[in-house]
Amino acid sequence: MGLGNSKPQHKKQLSLWHALHKTRATRYGLLADPLIGQSSTLQEECDKALKESLIRKRNGKMTPEGRKLQEGDKWDEWSDEEDEVGFPVRPRVPLRQMTYKLAVDFSHFLKEKGGLDGIYYSDRRNQILNLYALNEWGIIDDWNAWSEGPGIRYPRCFGFCFKLVPVDLHEEAETCERHCLVHPAQVREDPDGINHGEVLVWKFDPMLAVQYDPNRKYLTDMHDLGKRK
């Protein structure tokens, strides 16, 4: 009886085996030429970055509290934050002075990207703006200066289409958790270093690119600005 039952089962296995071998083999095509180039380039960059990270000499001695400097080490030769993601810390383009056309182009770029208009002013954000202009556009950071307060702060660089406008916070905003502690709305920092008790926001004003009055206090000669610094 066992023999009789095993024959149908054996036939089923043979039929399944034949069915599998009759199935068409799947053909895999090659990547398009542009994709091949991108893939190889990315692979080369990853291999290079990995190799540099493995052979790079690190100063200091690792301890449970972190890496500590030893005798002869310099502070700027290493950083525990070097693997963090962010924009480049060194200029990627040749350095250049701010010009009228460059200031207008830079202003409209910031406006289109929505990265500055309506944002609370703070010293830290102003420094980030300087770093971005320096590293991505190659603009030397002697352009970012403002008229004295209180009131609206106008850019001293003719062509830069952003001004700092004081705003009044309503009661809900002042008590909101998002505006507590070190939030720029509560810190009330001022570009001239004097606390006028005002909350400032960047405001885009395209008329700053066409209205030039040398007699107004907020527009100064760039040579005089450079001498003061």
UniProtKB/Swiss-Prot annotation:
Signal peptide: none annotated. The keyword rRNA-binding does not apply. Residues 127-143 are annotated as: Mediates dimerization. GO terms for cellular component: host cell plasma membrane; membrane. It is a lipid-anchor. Its main location: host cell. Keywords: Host cell membrane, Host membrane, Host-virus interaction, Lipoprotein, Membrane, Myristate, Viral immunoevasion, Virulence. Residues 76-84 are annotated as: Acidic. A lipid is attached at residue 2 (N-myristoyl glycine). It is found in: Host cell membrane. InterPro entries: HIV-1_Nef_core_sf, HIV_Nef. GO terms for molecular function: GTP binding. This is an African green monkey isolate. Belongs to the lentivirus primate group Nef protein family. Seems to play a role in optimizing the host cell environment for viral replication without causing cell death by apoptosis. Enhances virus infectivity and pathogenicity. Probably involved in viral immune evasion mechanisms. The N-terminal domain is composed of the N-myristoyl glycine and of a cluster of positively charged amino acids. It is required for inner plasma membrane targeting of Nef. Homodimer. Interacts with host CD247/TCRZ; this interaction induces down-regulation of cell surface TCR/CD3 complexes. This is Protein Nef. It comes from Simian immunodeficiency virus agm.vervet (isolate AGM3) (SIV-agm.ver). The lineage of its organism: Viruses, Riboviria, Pararnavirae, Artverviricota, Revtraviricetes.
